[in-house]
Amino acid sequence: MSDWVYGFFMAWGMFLAIPCPKKIWRESARRKMLACLPLVGCVVGGVWVLCACLAQWLPGPLAAALLAAAPWLVTGFLHLDGFMDVCDAVLSRRDLETRRRILKDSHCGAFAVICMVLLAMGQWSAFLSARSLSLWGLALIPVASRSCAALAVLTLRPLDSSQYSAMQRGGGPVWFAAVCLALSAVLPLLLAGSFAPAMTAVGCALAAWYGYRQLDGMSGDVSGFALTVGELWGVLTLAVWR
């Protein structure tokens, strides 16, 4: 069986709360697993669009709550964990060694809680204030964010403590993720005039670079932080523009 097939099902099993139809693992397919993150984003985007269709029958605040929580629920809150860990580490404003130690600490600090509350408020408010949603834009926001996050992990120098520290960089997986990123940014613009996925990619890239600089390395937590921030940028773009 191809490493790409293994990579897809590995990505599904690791990054989605939806039960994986085929639980398989091959260590040599780890890079392909990251490259398949955009395909996982297609699943998340599909669920998000279904929720948007259902939300039309709900009162505004409930509809906004459903849409805000949908991408978190379908991923089992996995990326929020990285978002909160990075917020705790970076906002401590301590030296590099201490920031890295806080990143690995399993306890939840005040900075993480505050940032999570602000994130939830921002995402809920964006959906509540949106007069209409581009379904193409909504569907491809998770694809753009995961393409960008995959590129960051596959190309940037990892933290020594990262599970991806021994992984080879470059190659086919990088090109696959880059093509997915380009398509997810351009297609909704051409088909529906939506800038949301493109802005998602911009937000994700900036957040990944910020986390990388602050912690002097890339990790799964930094990737989750960047993905979460990027999706917020995309949702805000949907609300205020299209």
Per-segment meaning from a language model:
Residues 30-48, 89-133, 137-138, 175-189, ...:
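Multi-pass membrane catalytic core of lipid/isoprenoid biosynthesis enzymes
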Residues 19-25, 78, 97-98, 150-160, ...:
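C-terminal ends of transmembrane helices
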Residues 7-13, 27-52, 166-170:
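N-terminal beta-alpha supersecondary unit
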Residues 1-25:
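Membrane-proximal soluble regions of multi-pass membrane proteins
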Residues 92, 147-181, 215-218:
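Solvent-exposed interhelical
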Residues 35-87, 136-140, 194-213:
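Membrane-embedded alpha-helical segments that form the functional core of polytopic membrane enzymes
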Residues 70-108, 211-230:
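Acidic (Asp/Glu-rich) catalytic motifs at the cytosolic membrane interface
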Residues 17, 21, 79, 88, ...:
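Alpha-helical transmembrane segments and their lipid-water interface positions
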